[in-house]
Amino acid sequence: VKRSLPVVATLLAGSGFCALVYQTAWMRQFRLIFGASTFATAAVLAIFMGGLGLGSALLGRRADRHPNPLRFYGNLELLIALSAALSQPLLWLVGKVYIALGGSVTMGVFGATLVRLILATLVLAIPTILMGGTLPAAARAVTTSDDAGRRRLALLYGINTLGAVAGALASTFFMLETFGNRKTLIIAVLLNLLIAMIARAMTSGADVSSAPVEESSSALPARFVYASAAIAGFAFLLMELVWYRMLGPLLGGTTFTFGLILAMALLGIALGGTAYSLWSGGGGATVSGFALTCTLEAALLMLPYALGDRIAILANYLRVLGHSGFGGFLFGWTIITAIVVLPPAIIAGVQFPLLIALLGRGREEIGEHVGRAYAWNTLGAIAGSLAGGFGFLPLFSAPGCWLIAAMLLVALGLGAALYARNIPSIVIAACAVACAFALGPTALWRHSGIGAGRAETPQNPNEIRTWTNATRRMTVWDADGRESAVALADADDRSFIVNGKSDGAARGDAGTQVMGGLVGAMLHPNPRKALVIGLGTGSTAGWLGAVPSMERVNVVELEPVVLRVAQACTAVNHDVLHNPKVHISIGDAREVLLASRDRYDIVFSEPSNPYRAGIASLFTRDFYEAVRARLDRDGIFLQWVQAYGIDVETMRTIYATIGAVFPHVATWRTGEGDLLIVATREPVTYDLARLRQRAAAEPYRSALHATWRVESAEGFLAHFLAGDRLTRVVSHDALLNTDDQTPIEFGFARSLGDSSRFHMDQVIALAFGLGCAKPERMNGTIDWHAVLLQRAFEIDLTPVPSIAGADERVHHEFASLWDKSNFGGAMTVWTRNGRWMPVNSAEAAMVAESIVYSGAPDDPAPYLAMLRAWEPLEADVIEAAFRIRKGDRAAAIALLRRAFAGYRATAWPQPEIMGRGLALAKSVGAPAEMYAALEQPFAAAQLEELRLRTLYDLGRQIDHCGPRTLAALKRLEPWAPWQLELLQDRVNCYAQAGLHDLAAAAQNDLRDYQANMPEALAR
């Protein structure tokens, strides 16, 4: 037996490797069939884990009775390999059956969940039940009667889990990317067969029977041990969900992120099991030891909670390692994951073999003990997973569940400690409870965009507090939903944040969110039915629902909490939630497309970035084939693609994948850094008469002006970048993104630190070079020079000298200078080139502002009149500046009051212009009137931070430390802007007003600020 221990441990490591590869591949394949919702994932996970637990309980007892446990183990591995190989045709059959039944679209949530359970059982029951028996059989084969603490079992458990670590890392970081799902699973099957053959070859004759051994000295009833195993499993799986939810925003939310978290949790368990096996002393397990593991695990869980945002700040600083490439990012992620996950996972690894040792000594009934303990542990884990996903996370939030998991372990440990009269465990439990009173993770950790690379990098403690307070102050609310963590943030715009990354702003992203759908409606001859994938701010669905010919707009949204976002964005989305044409369903878009029988004129897909975990499945050839099947013959598919932070190979793969399904693929630009791929089965005819008619009719007229700041068919076509030919050229020899193999999921995530990026200018230059920069099929004539002039004021694009005419370069130079607030320079360009008439309202605003703010003698009236026809609030602000220049402050005050009142009703004026209006409010000489005009927020939280700071400045002008100053300061609490003058004002004003609690908090803040100021050279 002793001689076989190293070999059996090696075999069990391979078994753990295969099991994790199987689990990863199966979960990915089932998500493609059932969808990625929590309901679907939980059904599959419950069957997988349930099979393991049931197999452990049933086969553990049989392992004790088998004359040769090692042969029994080898037979199990052989059957696992065969049943895993059989899973592939079964998955194909399951997909056909589920789609034929109509999925959740037809069966509803309850019916679909029941069917998922049945179908998942068909595929997973046999292999998972067999897997559950491998550890009991191996333990029976190598454990000796003199092993009182069952340390050989612990070693096997640790080595088996170490193999699982290797499986998690290999599948996530190499196998799935290189081979795809099916080949990865086949490789695991072949390895499993090798393990089975080696195990069977090692066996000869019957196993040696064991001598009777004394009962465990734990004096604990077995039911307590099994209940403890269940509670520990519940707490650990609940905590795994918390780790995924909490670490995703810090590490980027990619497939690599979640694979790393899983591997780190398994590594901790492996190290803990191995450590237990090497524990000094030959005695058995004790209740005191178990109490110590529970309380220590709880304390180590709570330590990162108590550290709170300090861990987020560390994660932000570690992102600098990404400058060296993907390996640098991975190293930084590993540090953060190790800090949060590894210590409690190590203790959990000690805990499980200790529980089994409490049930008995040596090899007597070890198979049954392992089987039953594992079954109860797995049952608790299933309950923790289901409770966390369906109830606890949405109800208590991820930080709340963090506390619940730790307090469960504290309670379990205290119970055991009191039973064993173990004082150290009680002290450790008290430390864990004390950590619960810390502030814990805040919006800085969860919603500041650290993992997405959107966070600032502060250089000193006061800059850290500036960033910390601003992030917390701007977060209006956050919530943990079934699928994601969602937050609403008000800064310069109202934006929503999903799993740590901003997924859209009410006004700032309206060019894509509004026009992404309306481009299809403009081009389609008679749009009547549309499908929108992702609700977001509700803008796409709301504006499509406003199209007169549109009869129905179906929206599929995965996360129910996002409906709260749409409700908060009614100022920009045509009150989408109350539009009878718009029908919102909660579910997975893939499943809906595959299972429904509806047909559409327009399908618009704007998921999150494809490098984020699970999103790449909405960019696969299989998904696009499902879209094509749901489109009418002249239907239009619209795919948003980010043009920022993306590598060229990923962009080529996206083009190639769409082009493999749709023969006609055009490229549009909807906003800064946003591309729109317009894909059809038939070539699109651009009917200029129809385009002009629609550009002048609602809702197109308002949408074109509000989001793109154009007012004509020429302005609309200015956002067309390239036709079919570009797609064919770019797609040549590019990899395809398929359900089986998703290169953009892995390759894109790997390239995030790469300095060689794609830029939209590349599309423009290539389109001109290929001669496909204009639509190929046009009815009617158009002055393309006028189209290019409309594009010229898009300042984020760089006119390519070889393709841009002189006029375009001049207009672009003028717009660029205006964007930098260089109004004198802009005036020089404008006057030097003949004082041209603006091509649209946006350029009219630029000309008027340049005249007013540069002090030029030109009369802004003609340009203000042109602007006022489209955007009267902008005209009011610019005219107010002109009146101040002329000394007519009364007129300026009236204009500003009117502009601010109007800004509360509409979010569409340009923020740059309205921001200059807020600056005028402080200098116009009427602080009380301006204060009153700014007390209410603007529509969709436009310029909210600037408005609040302006109120404070105006309050100081009116009554320094008086009622209005106090009211303005309270609006900034409790996370006040970290600036010395304001911090001093808080102390003085609150003290004068007798607001002692606020004054004390303000004094502490001021003291912190001053303590972190640079020391003066001279004193």
Model-assigned labels for residue ranges:
Residues 782-825, 843-853:
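Alpha-helical segment of the N-proximal tetratricopeptide repeat
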Residues 978, 985, 989-992, 996-1019:
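Terminal, low-structured helical/coil segments at or just beyond the last alpha-helical repeat
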Residues 798-803, 822-835, 856-869, 889-902, ...:
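Alpha-helical repeat scaffolds
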Residues 688-793:
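SAM/dcSAM-binding transferase cores
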Residues 836-863, 867-884, 891:
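Secondary-structure-rich domain cores
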Residues 817, 851, 883, 921-924, ...:
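Residue at a conserved register position within TPR or TPR-like alpha-solenoid repeats
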Residues 803-812, 836-846, 870-878, 905-917, ...:
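Generic helix N-cap/helix-start motif at coil->alpha-helix transitions
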Residues 1-693, 748, 754:
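Alpha-helical transmembrane segments of multi-pass membrane proteins
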